[in-house]
């Protein structure tokens, strides 16, 4: 749901009042000029970041659509990470950071994407990159989303992810989940948790959903 600036401000105030521990991170992120990539943090809600820090360990194989600070963050904490990116310039930036951090357990792959329509997207190398089972799948990449859109690339990725996620404790993470209410109704997960809070380098409140299988 799209909010007015006034509604966003009220929601932010309510969130900070209900979760005082987010006050310090919020103001720290507000005064920094660093990006999530430079901070080595996912661009998720703060609540989701806290939760994945408790959940993730070095036995997990992770797949990620969309690269950035999350790629560095996850690579440091998992067994193996495969990340799919479609934007060449951004790919080079993230690749450079991953090499600097010596994350030898990560694979960053550049894959073409086609957003002409949903079928073209599903047939693109970007969508077809997921071809094996993973413990954790993160959906935080490119999208075809907006008030006039009839389909969403991230929703399509979610349905693909449900085919490949481990059914023995697997986890699918959907960022900016407020955009995709249909996924909360169509999930096949055993449990779903909505993490709504502030996030790194965000001016307002966002949500990141965890689907447990």
Task: Give a label for each model feature.
Residues 127-136:
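A short acidic, Gly/Pro-enriched loop at the edge of an enzyme's catalytic core
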Residues 1-43:
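Membrane-proximal basic amphipathic "stem/tether" segments
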Residues 112-128:
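Surface-exposed interaction regions that form or flank ligand-binding interfaces
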Residues 59, 78, 134, 189-190:
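Short, well-ordered alpha-helix to beta-strand connector turns
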